[in-house]
Amino acid sequence: MATGYVNSSWLPDAKGYSIRSGYCWLQGMNPSVSWYSEVWDNWCVPKHSFIGWLIKHEALNMKEKLHKLHLTDNDCCILCAAGPETHMHLFKSCSYSKQILSMIEDWMQIKLEHGIQHGTELQRHACRMAQMACWYYIWLERNKCRIELKLMKPACIVKDIRRLVHTRINQFIRLPLLNVDKTWVQHLDILC
């Protein structure tokens, strides 16, 4: 804390030291990231957001990393066996993951990335929530598969994600809705 003071005066705030100014000074200037609102959307389930945050930081223990540390015999993706298990592969290129994301996008009638960037407010929240749920369930299934050596069909996982997204939309939805959102929500109700 010594560098916050010069000649007995508090540098960060001309009014002097306060708990708030001290806390802000200790935090420092953190660069903002473009994906913050995508991961930490208040409609998302917190444990899903946490996994999303780990994914964005590439901090999950993937087989590629474990293989380099000689903790596993291969680095092959356990879900599709088509490439090394990296963050990019598991959540973007893996055929198993792509199936889940595609089925969710078909149900929601919107590409998740497009909905997050360009959708109505309701669609942005719902797409962020669906994205985090997909990533969470993919990671959960990957871990179950490593332990139990059996893989659940993507349709079963999609059913769970759809139920969760549908329930949470109904919890957070605020009336009145835009006409486009009314039609969209009715479509989700019909297909859930």
Each model region followed by its residue ranges:
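A helix-boundary/hinge signal
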Residues: 1-192
